[in-house]
Amino acid sequence: YIPNSLYNFHPGSHTGQGSDVGIDLTSTMISEVFKTVKNASTKLLSETMAGKGSEIGRTFEEVKQIIDLAEQKFGSSLKGRLGVCLDTCHIWDGGYDIVSNLDGVIEEFDKIIGLENLYAIHLNDSMNPLGAHKDRHEKIGKGHIGFETLYKVTRHPKLCNLPFILETPNEQSGYIEEIKMLKK
């Protein structure tokens, strides 16, 4: 346990039982975590997913359902304790067109989930075209999202103060180069 930290998780899969069952199970597990660790200051972040197979959290609406149901089951507000990590590869692969409509996607996120619930961003390019539902991360500027869009994400006034985490297929030296590119 590290006080005041962020703990990111993938919300899981419904394994053929349907999204509602998966969302219910995930929200139950979140509620149990908070019941067990009552006074922890660590924030639990549900990651946005690409929608491969039977993944849940593949739309902003599903992520919101997970949060709302967890709050309902916990019995009190989880505001400030439960939030979201937005993964650029996942939302692109899930069908959110951040290349052509970054502002629109951010507005949609805000309308459905609320930007006050966004605590971190996984910054990745994607090997796949928009809406492929595959979750294949690519190095910054080498995929279908492209450097220009990812740079805009890091400079966007509604996102620029969040922590950005690279999850690109790289060695240490590759991460150093990507960070240098993004800081220019």
Stretches with model-predicted labels:
Residues 7, 44, 87, 121, ...:
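Conserved, mostly hydrophobic/aromatic
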Residues 1-83:
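Active-site acidic/histidine proton-transfer and metal-coordination neighborhood
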Residues 3, 32, 36-43, 79-83, ...:
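A structural signal for the main folded, soluble domain(s) of proteins
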